[in-house]
Amino acid sequence: MTIKIAIDCMGGDHGVSVTVPAAISFLASHDDAAVVLVGLPDAIQAQLKKLRAQDHPRVSVVPATEVITMDDPVEVALRKKKDSSMRVAVTQVKEGLAGACISAGNTGALMAVSRYVLKTLEGIERPAIATTIPNEQGWGTTVLDLGANADCEPEHLLQFARMAEAMVAVVDHKEHPTVGLLNIGEEVIKGNEVVKRAGELLRASELNFHGNVEGNDIFKGTTDIVVCDGFVGNVALKSTEGLAKMIGGMIKEEFTRSWFTKLLAGIAMPVLSRLAKRLDPARYNGASLLGLRGLVIKSHGSADAHSFEWAIKRGYDAAKNGVIERIARAFADKTSAAGAAPASPETAPTPHPSTRAA
């Protein structure tokens, strides 16, 4: 069974110098995968030649004549750059030529292009951005939305929870994962009207709802999933990234302050190495755009090759485990349970040809 991954090679701060090496490294550890490199052919081929991978049997190149920059507004991405590497890569997923698309490009453009090309699954009003944040338990907490929807209705938060539950169940192999609603306190009376109403909907749902959680619960691993609107989620994510960077810098500064602290650093190196591995941001790179009729993974724009490879792995795992099919099935089941007409074939899509037995 071959899993094909389409890669927007031109996206992000570093383009082909990161995306192509990451793709080749990924293939070295995944014999059942293939990559479709999308972008300016000359730039891609030059990188493949450097890596002596120009004849790799599991690499194909699909040309695109345009590049969406990190500063391009959504209107430009959608209306003017119709042959961008980002759009062509997403189209590979739509046409069943790839099981997932990975891009480090402009987040707003990627969401807009993906929603325009792939459309949302039946029963889902808004896609959401989800990622995993490290916690004390060691497996990470899935948090969404991280910026796609600054303003949400209570029903949207319920939908986000259902999408995340479906993803975590198949990717992390956790049936009935716990769900928490991010709030300013655990009490049901806390929060604004949207959050309080969302709590009521979650408590009445079939989900394994833990209740309200606070920001520190994300890192405790109190629940497997934490749901919030995109405004709160984005602030939480950026604050987490900033804090981690600050603490890392402070530790480095203290351990290099004198010859004695450098000696202590050498003694503590095994412990520091294990800690660095647990908190390695590269392992958590790759946010999933949930709710679409195809898999799209957003890598951090400044990712290096090691970090981008983890984003590819995230897309590979999601495609291999049938995340889209699981989400579609969850919403189709809810529609049927509510007495609606049976789901159409579009509601529960069959696996992409790229994920079937080769």
From Swiss-Prot:
| EC number in record | 2.3.1.274
Its GO CC terms are: cytoplasm
Fetch the Gene3D superfamilies from UniProt. Isopropylmalate Dehydrogenase
Enumerate the subcellular locations listed in this protein's record, separating them with semicolons: Cytoplasm
Q: Residue ranges of region Disordered? A: 336-358
Under catalytic activity, the entry for this protein gives:
a fatty acyl-[ACP] + phosphate = an acyl phosphate + holo-[ACP]
Give the pathway.
Lipid metabolism; phospholipid metabolism
Mention one GO biological process in which this protein takes part, according to its record.
fatty acid biosynthetic process
Query: Which residues lie in coiled coils?
Result: none
Keyword vocabulary terms for this entry: Cytoplasm, Lipid biosynthesis, Lipid metabolism, Phospholipid biosynthesis, Phospholipid metabolism, Transferase
What GO terms are given for molecular function? phosphate:acyl-[acyl carrier protein] acyltransferase activity
Its top-level enzyme class, in one word, is transferase
* HAMAP family assigned: PlsX
* Protein family (similarity comment): Belongs to the PlsX family.
* PANTHER family tied to this protein: FATTY ACID/PHOSPHOLIPID SYNTHESIS PROTEIN PLSX, PHOSPHATE ACYLTRANSFERASE
Oligomer status and interactors: Homodimer. Probably interacts with PlsY.
Q: What is known about what this protein does?
A: Catalyzes the reversible formation of acyl-phosphate (acyl-PO(4)) from acyl-[acyl-carrier-protein] (acyl-ACP). This enzyme utilizes acyl-ACP as fatty acyl donor, but not acyl-CoA.
List, alphabetically, the NCBIfam families matched: plsX
- Give the protein's recorded name: Phosphate acyltransferase
Q: Which organism is it from?
A: Cupriavidus pinatubonensis (strain JMP 134 / LMG 1197)
For this protein's source organism, the top of the classification is: Bacteria, Pseudomonadati, Pseudomonadota, Betaproteobacteria, Burkholderiales
- Write the gene name: plsX
